[in-house]
Amino acid sequence: MATAVVLTERAESLGLPITKNAFEGTLENPVPPLPYMVYLLPREATAGADSRPNNLMADDWQLELYTVADDETAEEIRTRIENEVLHDVDYVKFVAHVDSEECFQTAYEVTGLLRKARK
């Protein structure tokens, strides 16, 4: 069963730079060159009407790919994400140009990933 942890591990295995929420560039550790990925965990909620007895949580997980252009290289990376990371979950995909960063963003949103709640 895919969980947010499993999806993050799969994304890390692609070999691109990846971080949670945002890269915080410093002089000693600058933001990596494009392409890179950012993952987010925007929401978690109890699952089911009997959420206490079944002890389940439903997480949302988002992966953002940032590339220089919306070109063949970006499409190859998106194909790898879809085939190697997201192959067993439903997702919504958005592609947009980010003017302020002079790059393209592909965002994948996955909702309702079930996991056992921590006790």
What is each stretch, according to the model?
Residues 1-51, 72-76:
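Small/polar-rich, solvent-exposed N-terminal microdomains that initiate assembly or binding
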Residues 7, 11, 18, 63-65, ...:
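Hydrophobic beta-strand residues in large extracellular and virion-surface proteins
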Residues 47-54, 117-119:
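Short, basic, helix/turn surface patches
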Residues 76-119:
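Acidic-leaning, charged glycine-interspersed low-complexity segments
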